[in-house]
């Protein structure tokens, strides 16, 4: 049985407003979930559903105002645990330009290990391994501001990999990228998950990205309201739409075909699956 890397027990989080007199804004409510090591989980939900707050709790940037969150078996509210928790979970944020601080790619990737006192020879090894993992070995001497958006996010991921995390959380990390950049980053994430068993928690509003995960958490009004694999989640087209979310175009097409009386599956997600299914229907006609 795989170890549990994230466990939330009745977690709530409330933001304080400007003054003590004004009420707190409760953005997470009675949140309960478990995520095992090696899972690839997408988290979706409309704006204001609590996705980004949940992401920041996972790295102990924020601490629950109620309930208990365990990361790698350690409670985030215990200050003595924070160092280890932040080494266990790395964060990649929305804007790649806000995460790169050095004047060369290799210096940026080395920044984290240098700041925790890793020996120089080990840092060199980690930088090379991290850049190889994200496919940027040939760019190690490059100036970060000369890179594309997708390449910059891959540098940010490499910087986290150099810290040897067990889990990477991406908070809308592809939202500012063009389709090519998103494709680059998603390939890296899948490789890290499948080849290196790194847990991936991907906060996204792109449904075509969510279907690449092995599990999807759907959030609404601070709660996890749906939990399942992509086929289970996106077969519930009307429920997803009622939550203010889009569904993958292929899933919506087959939902409409089914409503019109066609005998088609309700769990088709990709263009390739759609082509095969429609070809079989035509052949039988």
UniProtKB/Swiss-Prot annotation:
Membrane topology recorded in Swiss-Prot or TrEMBL: Peripheral membrane protein
UniProt cross-references to InterPro entries, sorted A to Z: AAA+_ATPase, ABC_transporter-like_ATP-bd, ABC_transporter-like_CS, ABC_transpr_CbiO/EcfA_su, ECF_ABC_transporter_ATP-bd, EcfA_1, P-loop_NTPase
EC number: 7.-.-.-
UniProt: ATP binding residues: 45-52
GO-annotated molecular function: ATP binding; ATP hydrolysis activity; ATPase-coupled transmembrane transporter activity
Keywords carried by this UniProt record: ATP-binding, Cell membrane, Membrane, Nucleotide-binding, Translocase, Transport
Primary location class: membrane
Transmembrane region(s): none
Record localization: Cell membrane
Entry GO terms, CC: ATP-binding cassette (ABC) transporter complex
Domain ABC transporter: 6-246
Function: ATP-binding (A) component of a common energy-coupling factor (ECF) ABC-transporter complex. Unlike classic ABC transporters this ECF transporter provides the energy necessary to transport a number of different substrates.
Family: Belongs to the ABC transporter superfamily. Energy-coupling factor EcfA family.
Known partners and oligomeric status: Forms a stable energy-coupling factor (ECF) transporter complex composed of 2 membrane-embedded substrate-binding proteins (S component), 2 ATP-binding proteins (A component) and 2 transmembrane proteins (T component).
Protein name, per record: Energy-coupling factor transporter ATP-binding protein EcfA1
Species per Swiss-Prot/TrEMBL record: Acetivibrio thermocellus (strain ATCC 27405 / DSM 1237 / JCM 9322 / NBRC 103400 / NCIMB 10682 / NRRL B-4536 / VPI 7372)
Lineage: Bacteria, Bacillati, Bacillota, Clostridia, Eubacteriales
């Amino acid at each position: 049985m795989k170890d549990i890397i994230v466990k939330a027990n009745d977690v709530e989080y409330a933001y304080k407003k400007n003054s003590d007199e004004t009420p707190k804004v409760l953005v997470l409510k009675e949140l309960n979930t478990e995520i095992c090591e090696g899972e690839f989980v997408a988290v979706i939900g409309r704006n204001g559903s609590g996705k980004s707050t949940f992401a920041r709790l996972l790295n102990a940037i924020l601490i629950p105002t109620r309930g208990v969150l365990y990361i790698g078996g350690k409670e985030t509210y215990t200050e003595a645990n924070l160092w280890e928790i932040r080494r266990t979970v790395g964060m990649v944020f929305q804007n790649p330009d806000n995460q790169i601080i050095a004047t060369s790619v290799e210096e940026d990737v080395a920044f984290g290990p240098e700041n925790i006192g890793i020996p120089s020879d080990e840092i060199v090894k980690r930088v090379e391994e991290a850049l190889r993992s994200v496919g940027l070995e040939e760019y190690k001497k490059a100036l970060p501001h000369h890179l594309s958006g997708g390449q910059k996010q891959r540098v940010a991921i490499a910087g986290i990999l150099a810290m040897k995390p067990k889990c990477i959380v991406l908070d809308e990390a592809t939202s500012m990228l063009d389709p090519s950049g998103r494709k680059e980053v998603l390939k890296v994430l899948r490789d890290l998950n499948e080849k290196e068993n790194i847990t991936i928690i991907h906060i996204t509003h792109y449904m075509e990205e969510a279907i690449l995960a092995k599990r999807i958490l759907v959030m609404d009004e601070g709660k996890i309201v749906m939990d399942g694999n992509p086929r289970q989640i996106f077969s519930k087209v009307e429920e997803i739409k009622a939550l203010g979310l889009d569904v993958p175009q292929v899933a919506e097409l087959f939902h409409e075909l089914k409503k019109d009386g066609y005998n088609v599956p309700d769990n088709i997600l990709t263009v390739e699956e759609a082509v095969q299914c429609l070809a079989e229907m035509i052949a039988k006609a």
